[in-house]
């Protein structure tokens, strides 16, 4: 029986082992026509079919601080101010606003997904996470904080 335990363990748990592939297939996830709420003025924001760099973050996320600076620079230096959207994910709205007051506002769209519906539909694992949306479809996911190499890839490969 001792010799069969490792085999039994593999049979039971092997199907649950998967890897995360950030390159999506032709079955890309569509996210158009979602409504979010602005963190700035509480107005409705519609996620449409345009090009969007959609970043999920939270005020308690230490990696999100550095990434926030990168996204501000990306938006301001590459004329993408209407294309970068930071979505506060499973966080207290007041804490999110305090984060922005502490670390600055950029030429970025700041939103909250109050019901987490968009995050659930698009398969968010956690924060930070960034999705590249082209024509209403997520075509690339960056799980974890963005780095300069990721930023360069975004600038060179997407509209």
What kind of feature is each model-predicted range?
Residues 2-10:
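Sec-dependent signal peptide recognition
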Residues 11-18:
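Hydrophobic h-region of N-terminal signal peptides that target proteins for export
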Residues 18-45:
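N-terminal "domain-start" segment that seeds a small globular fold
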Residues 44-65:
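Short active-site neighborhood of thiol/selenol oxidoreductases, capturing the structured segment around
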Residues 53-54, 84, 130:
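Hydrophobic beta-strand anchors of alpha/beta hydrolase catalytic cores
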Residues 66-103, 114-120:
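Structural microenvironment flanking redox-active thiols in thiol-disulfide oxidoreductases
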Residues 82, 108-109:
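Short, conserved active-site loop motifs that form the nucleotide-linked donor/cofactor pocket
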Residues 102-106, 113-156:
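Thiol/disulfide oxidoreductase modules built on the thioredoxin-like
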